[in-house]
Amino acid sequence: MPVLPELSLNERRLVELIFKNRGVARIELAQMSGMTGATVTRLVASLLDLGLITEEADRSGAQGQPRRLLQLQARRFFAAGVTFSVTRMEVVIIDLSGSIVATRSVEVHTASPMEVVEAAQAAVDDMLAALSIQKNDLVGIGVSVPGNFGTASNLLKAHPFFPAFEDGQAIEAFREAFDVPCHVENDGTAAALGEYVFAGDNVLDDPLFFIHIGHGVGGGAVIDGRPYGGAHGNACLPGVLYPYDQPRPSGQDLLATLHAAGFHLRDFEEMDAMPQAARSTVIEWITRAGAQLRQAVRVATAFFDPARIVVGGRLPGDLNKRLVETILSEPIEGPSRGLPTAPVSVSRLGIRAGAVGAGCVPFFRAFFTGAVANGGSAYLNGRRPFPRTPAQ
């Protein structure tokens, strides 16, 4: 298991503020957190000892004594993210800044859960060795899957294209195979979390709603600093607006549309090399899909009143950008009298949203206050009963 200890609630508050502000002085941390200066000083000292953060002089300001800014030590801890398309599995290692430091694309030819897990495990081990990263510096592994959860946490109803994940077998296999915490999340929620943590340059982007265009039309939301999954992890599914027996604004629908026009692409990865002759088909699809997604924007605004709605997923970045342009090309009726729809933007993570989002899940569980379910934690006062090992 990693050397990272369980952080107190107050330590998580500070780390989360540093995550979101990317360079902040101690006095600002005290103001934003509501803690006393003495408490901030004590907690910052322990986080510095752990090697999780650094403090450096800011020499970009006026003359005189420079401010000292706290930032994450990006390469202190790492996480792995695993995400899937029909034919391939993408496995990445990300650092605390959300940067992908290594990636492997692995072909998937099997419906066997154990073979999928073994391939992911081999890819993670290979990347850690290539980067000389110790396993105890790996916070955990996040697995982003296209599917819905049943009433039991290990029961996953995967998209029909992903039989290896049916009935929770792969979930249990992932959790049993790795000697670090393994977290499984649906792809929409993982993408929303990655966008919130790593791409939100505005700390006021909460609530955030993510429309995830993958094989289906999924979604995710971050509300009050934590992913909102509902009772069983299946909240935020805008695809319910689009019947399966009719044209839908989904990635699979785009592949089917291209196939009907004579362009036989197996998966999203092949869209970057589409022939020029397919351009008119894609433009027609974007025009129709963008118009359909206006309804999702309106409904998401009505249900969640988000500060921002993000559109992203598995499509190439330029297609997502054109989808957003199409959505915004006509006025969208607000959800009620006098209420406008929420601002809409394209994902800043682009096609990396799935992999970075998956890797973000372990970081969120380890460092963010939203992952602490018990507000009555014994760690609330910022102290813990057991000593820990400082960074070497």
UniProtKB/Swiss-Prot annotation:
Keyword annotations:
Plasmid
Pfam families attached here? HTH_24, ROK
Which InterPro entries does the entry mention? ATPase_NBD, ROK, Tscrpt_reg_HTH_Crp-type_CS, WH-like_DNA-bd_sf, WH_DNA-bd_sf
Q: What's a single GO MF annotation on this record?
A: DNA-binding transcription factor activity
Q: Which domain of life is it from?
A: Bacteria
Q: Which CDD domains match?
A: ASKHA_ATPase_ROK
Q: Does the keyword ATP-binding apply?
A: no
Q: Does the keyword ATP-binding apply?
A: no
The family note in this entry says: Belongs to the ROK (NagC/XylR) family.
Q: What protein name does the entry list?
A: Uncharacterized protein y4fQ
